[in-house]
Amino acid sequence: MVAAFKWSISDWHELVDSGVLAQHRVELLEGEIIEMSPEGPMHSSTNHSVVEYFRELLGKRAVIREAHAITLDNSEPEPDIAVVRSPYNDYFSRHPYAKDIYWLVEISNKTLKLDLERKLATYARNGIIEYWVIDLVNKKLVVHTQPVGNSYTQIQNLTTGNISPQAFPDLAIRVDRMLLF
């Protein structure tokens, strides 16, 4: 049996710091280097729109990170949007850990299978309390909460109405405002 080499977080950081990966869109997921798909116009426009909307709603209550790494056990994915604890200067010397994350958002078109399977399992296993997938293919928001093991026990498929993140129950986020396509 042949086993794939698994990268540790420290080895991954050395590789990133060396510059070898500078021309590649990759991330570390469960010790494996995963090549990411290029973003199309729908993906990037949705990302920009949702980030601006979140910043309007949250102000300084949280930091909104766009496609920047987070550090989990044996993984350093770059979710499209990470809503993390303030202040921003906490992340000058490290990426946010699971304990810093309010919720994550992936915008999925070509990566829907990866986002709803492998990334979901990684996020759940690391205790990410809330994980949203903006499904560009099926025009819906899929909200995952209550992580247990490799999955989430609560899943909502939304196309209209409001959603309140667990970390901000007073916040009413319009689903249709995120699904502008």
Task: Show the residue positions of the predicted features.
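Gly/Pro/Ser/Thr-rich low-complexity, intrinsically disordered segments predominantly at protein N-termini
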Residues: M1-F181
